[in-house]
């Protein structure tokens, strides 16, 4: 016999279990609304305690609803009581969430103390109205030279971070969290969507060691969890970030890794709900689901949510519906290059492949725009000359091209930078470089003023003054 452990006014019972999806019947006139959270708390005949939260997705008629599970449905049987909570999934928000790891339901999973949150918020809400949005596009300084110069982040914008395994995505994410915490007194929220459990664990431990954990809230929906949890974990993290923006009036960074897995989970749920698949087997509601998430990530008059999203591209096909739908929402793309990582240039951001919609003279200013274009032109010319150099050697180039190559190699090295969060590995103190110092440094390299300095002087330094100082030390050796 199945015994109920929950008492509530609106109780139905399970009529069908299909993997992570259930159908439940409720009394006439007491149907739960779409997105309401349902709870099953019961004990099976074998003595197994079952506690599962569901989210209503469809109203089927005949007083029945179809709902998707947020955790494993093992042990569920027909006839078990289902309680309608009368509201969507609500999660803790505010300062109490910092330094903790949560699951999709806002429950701490780091074996720490219970979360003493004063406020809770539903994960489903509308995007801010137009009148609340800030109109003026404004660059967001990160202190990382290559990003600030060539792919500037837009305050309240969305950045796509493209990179394979081992090229430095996690370290770049940690450095951004560190810099926003130190320089902007800002906070970060990290959403692990379909993350490997090991990666999530590593990130938590690395943040603890580097001292940025107290400025970040972590929300994980791992690979092994049901599609419902992976589909909603991004909204849980976003809800926590929205509180810091709207109530605390702060600038927040929201990291989502990986946005493709959010789409993938939505596709699984769509199939389980019996919807007709769309192109390449994706859900017909792909653009709507993506829009509902992305439109909430924005700048308002109170504060901003700037989002950095890792994007996996299936089979390197940029026309695949998942990345193609994501691209429509991005303001900047930061591409991490394996060839730069192999040269030891970190962060391994590809200066020619990375771009930003706000790199325009009327937004960032003439000086910044012209410097960025000159840097790109120099690096592009160097790239074109590399085949000639490989076949004929450097000596066969014209004097003008030799000069371009020399400056491009200095620029390439000056785009590298020591990170605060990597101090324990490199032994070099981290550097936060202000935008005006970044622009000034590249202008001096481009002008030829520093042609006499050795290339090595520009490697892993912050400002151009440090490069000159390093050159003096190298000379004295």
Curated annotation (Swiss-Prot):
EC numbers: 7.1.2.2
Annotated CDD domains: ATP-synt_F1_beta_C (cd18110), ATP-synt_F1_beta_N (cd18115), F1-ATPase_beta_CD (cd01133)
Family in the record: Belongs to the ATPase alpha/beta chains family.
Top-level EC class: translocase
Assembly description: F-type ATPases have 2 components, CF(1) - the catalytic core - and CF(0) - the membrane proton channel. CF(1) has five subunits: alpha(3), beta(3), gamma(1), delta(1), epsilon(1). CF(0) has four main subunits: a(1), b(1), b'(1) and c(9-12).
Entry function: Produces ATP from ADP in the presence of a proton gradient across the membrane. The catalytic sites are hosted primarily by the beta subunits.
Molecular function GO terms recorded: ATP binding; ATP hydrolysis activity; proton-transporting ATP synthase activity, rotational mechanism
Phylogenetic placement of the source organism: Bacteria, Bacillati, Cyanobacteriota, Cyanophyceae, Synechococcales
Highest taxon in the source lineage: Bacteria
Reaction it catalyzes: ATP + H2O + 4 H(+)(in) = ADP + phosphate + 5 H(+)(out)
PROSITE patterns the UniProt entry points to: ATPASE_ALPHA_BETA (PS00152)
Record bears the keyword Nucleotide-binding: yes
Cross-referenced SUPFAM superfamilies: C-terminal domain of alpha and beta subunits of F1 ATP synthase, N-terminal domain of alpha and beta subunits of F1 ATP synthase, P-loop containing nucleoside triphosphate hydrolases
Record's bilayer topology term: Peripheral membrane protein
SMART domains: AAA
Keywords in alphabetical order: ATP synthesis, ATP-binding, CF(1), Hydrogen ion transport, Ion transport, Membrane, Nucleotide-binding, Thylakoid, Translocase, Transport
Residues binding ATP, per UniProt: 163-170
Subcellular compartments: Cellular thylakoid membrane
A GO cellular-component term linked to this record: proton-transporting ATP synthase complex
Keyword Glycoprotein: no
Organism: Synechococcus sp. (strain JA-3-3Ab) (Cyanobacteria bacterium Yellowstone A-Prime)
Chief subcellular location: membrane
Protein name, as recorded: ATP synthase subunit beta
UniProt xrefs under Pfam families: ATP-synt_ab, ATP-synt_ab_N, ATP-synt_VA_C
